[in-house]
Amino acid sequence: MRPNHRENNQIRPVKITRHYTRYAEGSVLIEFGETKVLCNASIEESVPRFLKGQQQGWVTAEYGMLPRATHSRNQREAAKGKQSGRTMEIQRLIARALRAVVDLEALGERTITIDCDVIQADGGTRTAAITGACVALQDAIHKLIADGVLKTNPLKGLVAAISVGIVENEAVCDLEYVEDAKAETDMNVVMVEDGRLVEVQGTAEGKPFSHMELLQLLDLADQGINQLFEVQRQALAE
């Protein structure tokens, strides 16, 4: 039996709260069950040096966990003086996912940075961050349009992500921490609205998974992400 008696294809309750903080152009608190991530989108009227004069914009992301987001306190990475490899991997993943739904030329020579801060972690922090960051990004870009800064909408749709895995020989969707800790296979799937994949990160822990199991996990991810798209649409309609 899964935690909270969920079915194998059932995601946790997901809540998206827009305009969560005052100053960011886009601000979202996303909750995947007990996992909570604050996603703030900030706009700068400049681009990184490697894009100077290229007539296009940039979307990037930063990711971090508050010291007491987990069961015991973790030292801030700023205090350590460097980011962990995990942190760098996750923020690059978030940025790639977001760029998949933005026409960078239509964005113009400006940068949107999404800061994803994990307030509380109970599995699936990177997938929650991507799903929430997409809504924050939408709000930031809609503000540029409303302010008359952009004449053409650079948004190409929604992007969302979910974790899937094999736990006790069962394929399951949206893993909580207790499931993730004992999963034989752990996979993160990022998808855009038309069903195309942006990224698939899958790893076997101890026992390899079969081609059939891979397809089963991708099918579960497709079901879960389509539910997330609906949550995003409802949030953006409010």
From Swiss-Prot:
It comes from the Bacteria. One of its GO terms (biological process) is rRNA processing. Signal peptide: none annotated. Its EC number is 2.7.7.56. InterPro entries: ExoRNase_PH_dom1, ExoRNase_PH_dom2, ExoRNase_PH_dom2_sf, PNPase/RNase_PH_dom_sf, Ribosomal_Su5_D2-typ_SF, RNase_PH, RNase_PH_bac-type, RNase_PH_CS. It catalyses: tRNA(n+1) + phosphate = tRNA(n) + a ribonucleoside 5'-diphosphate. Gene3D superfamilies: GHMP Kinase, N-terminal domain. One of its GO terms (molecular function) is tRNA binding. Keywords: Nucleotidyltransferase, RNA-binding, rRNA processing, Transferase, tRNA processing, tRNA-binding. Pfam families: RNase_PH, RNase_PH_C. Phosphate binds at residues 86, 124-126. Phosphorolytic 3'-5' exoribonuclease that plays an important role in tRNA 3'-end maturation. Removes nucleotide residues following the 3'-CCA terminus of tRNAs; can also add nucleotides to the ends of RNA molecules by using nucleoside diphosphates as substrates, but this may not be physiologically important. Probably plays a role in initiation of 16S rRNA degradation (leading to ribosome degradation) during starvation. Belongs to the RNase PH family. Homohexameric ring arranged as a trimer of dimers. This is Ribonuclease PH. The lineage of its organism: Bacteria, Pseudomonadati, Pseudomonadota, Gammaproteobacteria, Pasteurellales. The gene is rph.
